[in-house]
C-alpha cells in the first residue's frame, strides 16, 4: 500500500473516532450539551403575518436575505449578501432596480421621525455596501457605493448621491440634483451624461442578473461539471501555470 493510501485510511479512522467521542460526550452532558443546529439559508423568509413578494424575472442572489413585508417589482436584482429586512414596517422596491452586494435596506417602527417604511422606485441603482433606513428613493435615481440614507430622507426622481455620502434624517435631494459628502450637500445639477451612465448601469445589471440566475439555478452536479470543463480548458493554455516549467 502506498503512503498516500495509508494516510487516507488513518485519516478516516481518526475522523470517525472523533465523531464517536463527540456524540458520546454530548450524551454524557445530557441537557447541558451544546448541539450545533443546521442552518439552511433561504433567500425569502416570512416574518409575522407577512412574506416577501418577488416580481417576474427578478434575480435574488443565493445568499441574499429578503425578510418579511417586502415587495420587489419586475426585472430587479438583489445581489450577493444584500439584506432587505421588512420586519417592523414595509419595504417596496420597483421595477428594474438594482440593490448591489452587501447593501442593507431596513425600515422603522419607532425612529427619530416615527414609523416609516422604505420605498424605492423604478430604475434605481444602489451601490455596494450602502445602507438605506426608512428612506424614500424615487425612480431613476443613483445612490453611490457605501452611502447611507437615514430615517425620513428623500431622493426625488433623477436625484444622485455621490459614493460614500451620508444623507441625514429628513433631508431631501430635489429632482435633478447631485449631492455628496458627509453630511451630504448639494454639489451641482445632474447632467445628461449622468443620466446616460445610469441607464447603462441598469441595463448591464439586468443582463448580468439573467446570467447569474441561470448559473445559480444549476444543480451541484452541473456546477461541478462546469468547473471540470473550465479546468480542462485552462490546462491547454500556454500561459497556464500547470504548463509552465518551474
Swiss-Prot record:
Domain of life, per lineage: Eukaryota
Pfam families documented for this protein: Hexapep
InterPro entries named among the record's database cross-references: Hexapep (IPR001451), LbH_gamma_CA-like (IPR047324), Transf_Hexapept/Carb_Anhydrase (IPR050484), Trimer_LpxA-like_sf (IPR011004)
The name this protein goes by in its record: Uncharacterized protein DDB_G0288155
